[in-house]
Design a protein with these regions (language model features):
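Long, histidine/aromatic-enriched segments associated with O2/redox biology
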Residues: 1-203
């Protein structure tokens, strides 16, 4: 997805393993078992080890996944339904690896950071419309149906870091009922929403 300032790159691949556990050793063990079974017929492209940061915050300090659908209705947004019988119960997974310029981010005041995200940093309250810029992440990165109703996805983002390479980032993982929903979100972020606003978080 190529935009006027940034491009959301596409890395081809055939299989994605998303491994989560309370103990890192369990994640390693599962990944190792998978590798033992598939190493003769596959070529690994990338492996990212995320971690839980405090109370579910991204590495830039804001609570992540706030706008996920409630658990009792999550399947409605995240799982393919009767409209596609061949893939019913599956999900369209999007992954994006974002590297943050932490020096640039830390140079912003908390108030400036909040305007980038669209929420308060410490209590996770959404900014009021009279304060929140139209370029805020939680404004631009939304998808809507033909009637203008917001369509949600299930986010499972994780922060990651590699200090030796000065890499600090967010590994975006989104599960959606329809391919078009997450794509629309990314198009808004990188190419602009209906009003042409780009996601300032990408800066």
């Amino acid at each position: 997805i190529k935009g006027p300032k940034y491009t959301a790159v596409s890395t081809p691949g055939d299989v994605l393993f998303h491994i989560r556990a309370d103990k890192p050793a369990m994640c390693y063990e599962m990944a190792d078992l998978i590798n033992l079974q598939l190493k003769e017929i596959t070529q690994p492209i990338d492996a990212v080890q995320g971690f839980r940061y405090f109370d579910g915050r991204s590495i830039i300090g804001f609570v992540d996944g706030t706008e996920n659908p409630e658990p009792e209705i999550a399947a409605e947004y995240a799982l393919v339904g009767d409209e596609d019988p061949n893939f019913k119960g599956g999900s369209y997974a999007f992954i994006q690896k974002y590297i943050h310029d932490m020096d640039k981010w830390r140079a912003l005041s908390d108030e400036e950071q909040e305007k980038v995200i669209g929420r308060k940093k410490f209590n996770d309250v959404e900014l009021s419309d009279d304060v929140k810029p139209k370029t805020a992440h939680n404004v631009v990165s939304k998808a809507h149906d033909a009637d203008g109703n917001e369509i949600k996805i299930m986010r499972a983002n994780m922060p990651f870091s590699n200090p030796s390479k000065n890499e600090y980032g967010t590994f975006f993982i989104g599960y959606a009922r329809k391919f078009s929903v997450t794509r629309q979100m990314l198009e808004h972020m990188f190419q602009g929403d209906e009003e042409g606003n780009l996601d300032r978080l990408l800066d």
